[in-house]
Amino acid sequence: VVPHVDDVITAKKMVSNCRYPPLGHRSMTGSLPQVNFESYDIGNLSKEINSATLLVLMIETPQAVDNANAIAGIDGVDVLLIGTNDLCMEMGIPGQFDHKSIVDAYDTVIEACEKHGKHAGMGGVYNPELMARYITRGMRFILSGSDLSFMMAGAKIQAAAIRGLI
């Protein structure tokens, strides 16, 4: 997952850095941690690892939304993930996840992904009704919470259980 990918140049650089040849320029050896450091034919190995690697580029600014079609058209990109909190902040509408500008941004990214056979993703929206609305529109890579929110939910359950024992 790569944050703040605003343009084609940055997107291409991320593909180059994250993918093995022929898609990128990541260094290759015959034994990698992805295959338990066993020796493999590197020609086949690079293809297998490239196909098993998910490259997610975050769309978090109006510029990135404007460039979504071009970014989605880059070979080696799998998901365009809208970072909704950051996008709202950049647009000057903090927390307004159902604002027309955000809905339009979602539609733009979804259309770009559908056109190029990529997956549209969303993060930062955890209201079930809004999530359902955006999933219905075409979001397919869904962040349904954050590490911190999941840990805090578990901690609250544990704290309540302990308080019940006291």
Model-derived features: where do they sit?
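Hydrophobic faces of well-ordered beta-strands that scaffold small-molecule active sites
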Residues: 1-2, 55-60, 80-82, 120-123, ...
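Alpha-helix N-cap and loop-to-helix initiation/capping positions
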Residues: 6, 97-104
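Glycine-enriched alpha-helix->loop->beta-strand junction motifs that scaffold or abut catalytic
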Residues: 19-20, 74-79, 136-142
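Glycine-rich, proline-tolerant flexible connector loops at the mouths of alpha/beta enzymes
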Residues: 82-100
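Short beta-strand/loop segments at the ligand-binding rim of alpha/beta enzyme cores
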Residues: 47-60, 108-122
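C-terminal helical cap(s) of enzyme catalytic domains, especially alpha/beta-barrels
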Residues: 8-24, 148-166
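Conserved anion-binding
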Residues: 2-75, 86-89
